[in-house]
Amino acid sequence: MRKIAIILLSCLMAVTSMMAGNNAGYGPVKDEQAFRKELMTRTSAVTSIQAKFIQEKYLSVFSRIVKSEGRFYWQKPNSICLDYQTPAKYRITIAGDRIKTVSNGKANVISAKGNPMMDQMSSLIAACMTGNLSAMGSGFKTLVMESKSDFLITIMPQNQTVRNYIFKMEIYLDKRDYSVNRLVMYENETDYTGYVFSEKKFNETIPSAVFDVR
């Protein structure tokens, strides 16, 4: 189970931060109920997302940042693909309960079927990448703050097994369209992986081959 969990978590950490969250300028959201209602409305209207991403990973043991870039794809209801292009080719695809990784031209497919922890982690990843908190399920504590330009959602797993892999996550949503601008995942209090998304496209057709997990 641990091996599968590590592979699934690599959807967020595969090759290698955006700088660790600096919450200066953020305060409690004025009306959290209204925010959640609007977020639900916005995310429910999205059927697919394509974006460019820059990932930066920091591990305190190495005291350095490793940077990578690629393309992100998401399609309703539960298909995700991270296609890393630099500095090394790497691809991870999650579709339903199947996970496929391609590294150095070699593909590996595993099944997470019937594993509750895998379901929970997969839901968490989908929620964080898309901003759809309703996809997250139970077992997570959330804190919502805002600045002039964006919303900040901090997610803290309450399940200790999940916390062994994810200490907390921060999602930065653009106030203009409620899309994810930045995502920071903390493995612990010092090590983290961050993503910045750009060139976002919504509700455009994505070739089925992108999510092929055969």
Where is each model-derived feature located?
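Boundary at the C-terminal end of the N-terminal hydrophobic targeting segment
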Residues: 18-21
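Bacterial N-terminal signal peptides
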Residues: 7-16
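Gly/Pro-enriched, hydrophobic low-complexity segments
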Residues: 110, 133-214
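N-terminal secretory signal peptides
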Residues: 32-58, 71-73, 81, 89-91
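Structural recognition of beta-strand segments within beta-rich domains
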Residues: 62-66, 71-76, 80-86, 91-94, ...
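Positively charged n-region of N-terminal signal peptides that target proteins for export
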Residues: 1-4
